[in-house]
Amino acid sequence: MIEVEIKVKIDDKNKVVEQLKKLGFKFIKKKFQEDIYFNGIDRDFRETDEALRIRDEDGNFFVTYKGPKIDKISKTREEIEVKIEDKEKMRQIFKKLGFKEVPPIRKIREIYKKEDIEASIDDVEGLGLFLELEKSISDINEKDKVLEEMMEILKALNISKDNIIRKSYLELRGL
């Protein structure tokens, strides 16, 4: 799957939520996420623009690989994710294989949805508030159309496309 994603920093969560609802987004759920990232054995993922993580989402665990970003505008990239039963054993496996653990990213995420576009408001420990718009696609040829839709949503929220952040939360933390 390819995840088309854009992220912007926000100041007023309530204002953004109100605007999202006016655009037809519906609240889905609120959850806590802790992401434990690992750096590569044979390459530095910061240099190759890849990511490998274990996510704890309210007690549900996932391993995710993210490939390099595929454009200069967004955070669009290949994403492969699998649910796992035991995050600690997976963590041990990665360490035994030589992967280096990076300090975790913790956030409270509120998810809103309109059709197949998800809007997440993240309150990230040590970084503040962000809005992420994302949609999973299987055909790369859909990417530009999806990005156009997302740009229209930003415009309706009075957020300039110049405010788009391509850096991950790890990069924003300087890790």
From Swiss-Prot:
The active site is at Y37 (proton acceptor). Keywords: ATP-binding, cAMP biosynthesis, Cytoplasm, Lyase, Nucleotide-binding. It comes from the Archaea. Transmembrane segments: none annotated. GO terms for cellular component: cytoplasm. Gene3D superfamilies: Hypothetical Protein Pfu-838710-001. Belongs to the adenylyl cyclase CyaB family. PANTHER family: CYTH DOMAIN-CONTAINING PROTEIN, SI:CH211-156B7.4. This is Putative adenylate cyclase MJ0240. It comes from Methanocaldococcus jannaschii (strain ATCC 43067 / DSM 2661 / JAL-1 / JCM 10045 / NBRC 100440).
